[in-house]
């Protein structure tokens, strides 16, 4: 080895050590500061589900003017170090990370945990995994996570093509194809778990869970927004949806938690699926929980009609005027993130490309910018400017 090569190797090792020590210092700093919720700047933040930090994707998101991202995770990256690495990757590219995952651990998904919602074998193990997940987020300086409490998954019956020619996920409660799915499992009627549960059981199980979560979330400095049932219904396949399918249930659930760290992730699309049975439209939900600083995240989505039969739509193509939601968010001074939700595919033929997402017919992993994301972000930004009363 030449003298020059030796010097280069030593330099490389020093640079590697700097990076490693920097990451360790950041992790330690985040951990020591975890008793306080990480600072999130005021104001509405329009972001996206970020996907993978590939060169093409990062460039596309920059071109769209995106700053804030909501990210996924896998069991392999579900550690404090893994979350910190994800955060650093995105921050190095100029983005800011609002949340990573909706609960993920060694056993897989920690979201819609049937063991927790229905008190099935393995409940305490799942809860401990979830608590560790929240601790890891806090140590990595991630301020937020979404949680959902459905016991038998998200229910759909297929996809339908809308009059404008794109396709959306749909649910027809009268269809024999209606079923719930989550984390690779399928749930069907008449009884998804062999018996009918009572509302009292569902409430007892929620209370047991949230009382364990609150002190950990507060210590970690992580806010948790609870997602509505998708779809809202009094009961599906023997499992009551009595908590997060209606306004009064949400109020009681947040009161039971009694913590500044527990609030609402309002998925507008899911809520609109329920229609009048929810007891409050999205604007009423926003005004109640937003005025109490209990509104942490918004999924901006519309649907064609309330149940018994709906199809997910573009935000300007459903039955609800989404500009009302934006105005309400401005009125309550919402300061969380809002993202386009369940973005359909545009610029392709759903009849020939399957699922309407433009995925078929091209090599796996090939990047394809979805025009729908650009369209939805443009709509959302225009609505926000109008709601804020800004003039050109």
Question: Where are each of the predicted segments found?
Answer:
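Histidine-acidic metal/acid-base catalytic patches
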Residues: 2-27, 40-43, 116, 135, ...
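Active-site-proximal loop/turn and secondary-structure-junction residues that shape catalytic pockets
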Residues: 52-54, 75, 103-106, 149-153, ...
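Short, acidic/polar
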Residues: 51-61, 83, 127-134, 281-288
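A cross-family glycoside hydrolase active-site/sugar-binding cleft signature
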Residues: 47-51, 72, 98-101, 146-148, ...
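Structural motif corresponding to the early beta-alpha repeats
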Residues: 72-207, 218-219, 270, 335
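C-terminal segment of N-terminal export signals and the immediately downstream linker at the start
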Residues: 30-52, 59, 68, 392
């Amino acid at each position: 080895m030449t003298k020059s090569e030796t010097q280069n190797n030593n330099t490389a090792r020093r640079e590697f050590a700097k990076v490693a020590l920097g990451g360790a210092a950041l992790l330690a700093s985040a951990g020591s500061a975890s008793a306080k919720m990480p600072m999130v700047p005021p104001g509405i933040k329009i972001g996206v589900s970020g996907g993978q930090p590939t060169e093409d994707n990062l460039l596309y998101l920059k071109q769209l003017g995106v700053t804030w991202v909501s990210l996924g995770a896998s069991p392999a990256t579900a550690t404090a170090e893994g979350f910190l690495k994800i955060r650093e990757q995105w921050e190095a590219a100029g983005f800011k990370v609002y949340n990573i995952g909706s609960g993920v651990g060694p056993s897989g998904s920690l979201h819609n945990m049937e063991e927790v919602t229905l008190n099935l074998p393995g409940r305490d193990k799942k809860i401990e995994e979830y608590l560790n997940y929240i601790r890891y987020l806090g140590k990595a300086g991630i301020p937020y996570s979404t949680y959902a409490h459905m016991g038998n998954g998200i229910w759909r019956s297929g996809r339908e093509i809308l009059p404008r020619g794109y396709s959306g996920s749909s649910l027809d409660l009268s269809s024999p194809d209606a079923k719930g799915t989550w984390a690779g499992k399928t749930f069907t009627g008449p009884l998804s778990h062999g018996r009918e549960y009572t509302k009292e059981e569902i409430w007892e199980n929620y209370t047991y869970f949230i009382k364990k979560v609150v002190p950990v979330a507060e210590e970690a400095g992580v806010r948790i927004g609870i997602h509505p049932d998708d779809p809202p219904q009094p009961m599906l396949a023997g499992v009551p949806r009595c908590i997060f399918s209606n306004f009064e249930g949400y109020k009681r659930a947040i009161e039971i938690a009694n913590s500044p760290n527990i609030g609402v992730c309002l998925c507008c699309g899911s809520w609109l699926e329920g229609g009048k049975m929810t007891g409050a439209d999205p604007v009423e939900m926003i005004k109640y929980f937003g005025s109490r600083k209990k509104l942490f995240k918004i999924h901006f989505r519309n649907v064609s009609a309330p149940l018994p039969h709906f199809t997910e739509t573009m935000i300007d193509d459903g039955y609800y005027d989404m500009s009302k939601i934006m105005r309400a968010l401005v009125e309550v001074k919402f300061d969380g993130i809002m993202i386009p939700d369940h973005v359909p595919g545009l610029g392709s033929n759903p009849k020939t490309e399957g699922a309407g997402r433009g995925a078929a017919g091209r090599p796996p992993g090939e990047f394809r910018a979805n025009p729908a994301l650009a369209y939805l972000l443009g709509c959302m930004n225009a609505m926000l400017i109008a709601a804020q009363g800004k003039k050109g």
